[in-house]
Amino acid sequence: EDQSGQMAEVGFSLYTELLERAVKSIKAGKLPDVDDIDRHGADVELHLPALIPDAYLPDPHTRLTLYKRISAARDVAALRELQVEMIDRFGLLPEQAKHLFAIAELKLDATALGIRKLDLGNKGGRIQFVEKPNVDPMSVIRLIQGQPKHYRMDGPDKLRITLELPDPALRFNAARGLLTTLQPTQ
């Protein structure tokens, strides 16, 4: 039961990655690094299928290689190049693969802002920040004061979001809009 609660808190993919790293550390005789999460980027969960379908790319080895390359991309340009390469090699991207790339872009932006987790579903969700995020604090205050029914702080590091987002396009637009709003002013 404790594990399922922890899994829900950080997201399944990140949870399994952290668990795997912890097991490797223990096997090597070291203590797991609890601050490791901050160095490996934001967890973005939009509750949408985000994958490379078997029907699009049947070879599991090639799919795994592409997943690793998407995960390793350090900027939007690298993601766009990879999209073009996949379209050239395998044809137009199915919806799930488009979601995968869009979430990878959101993850890059969220990581740069110091967001630990961005979770948006049908009814909204939350943003969890690292201890010292790179966001404009006034933008958070303006969101909460301007739309108190939709935004509120839930503890010192979580922004709770209450919005109807039943459509994937609405969810992506809301996520992009929030990340843009939170950008620090230059």
Positions of PLM-derived features:
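Accessory helical-bundle/CTD segments and flexible terminal tails appended to RecA-like ATPase motors
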Residues: 1-186
